Design a protein with these regions (language model features):
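Key residue(s) within conserved catalytic/signature motifs
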Residues: 1-174
Length: 174
């Protein structure tokens, strides 16, 4: 295991933010969501910090899903969300049925027909709504932490979805 040096305060802040939305009083209340941005220079240990934090969340009974952004023009649209939603649905497969058609645009294995992926506003709205529903329903049974690593490399659709999820009331602690 890598040495974990000099990040105790950062880990404490992440833990406090998690507890603020997941633990009573004030937390674990319908509609609570939190957003924490971890910044720093390349190689400073952000991913190591988040890995340590994820271990704490899991030990506390929470769920953690990851998505990693690609650096470069070859990245598929929505890629970090495809990974995070795929992991969420793997852990809670019962959620897939209610959002299958909408999420098929970004989680291809959910498609029953060949989906058409475009930037049409209606498609984006359906994807945003379905992603929010999926994450909110997953968070209703246990606190859910979504980690989007290397967010500086995210495509605009992924950033827009993050904004939506962070501002939309959720039925659980997200």
């Amino acid at each position: 295991m890598l040495a974990f040096v000099g990040r105790t305060e950062s880990l404490a802040r992440l833990t406090a933010a998690y507890q603020a939305v997941s633990s009573p009083p004030g937390g674990a209340v319908s509609g609570w969501a939190g957003l924490v941005l971890v910044t720093g220079e390349a190689g400073i240990g952000k991913t190591t910090l988040l890995t340590r934090f994820a271990s704490r969340v899991r030990a506390d009974g929470g769920t953690v899903v990851w998505g990693t952004c690609w650096d470069g023009d070859q990245a598929p649209a929505w890629w970090p969300w495809t990974q995070a939603l795929r992991a969420t649905l793997d852990q809670r497969p019962n959620l897939a049925e209610t959002v299958r058609p909408e999420l098929a645009a970004i989680v291809p294995e959910l498609a029953t027909n060949s989906p058409v992926i475009d930037s049409d506003t209606a498609v984006r709205v359906r994807v945003f709504d379905a992603a929010g529903q999926t994450l909110g329903q997953a968070a209703a049974s246990a606190p859910l932490v979504v980690i989007l690593d290397d967010l500086h490399s995210a495509d605009q659709s992924s950033v827009d979805l993050l904004r939506f999820v962070a501002h939309e009331p959720q039925p659980g602690a997200l």
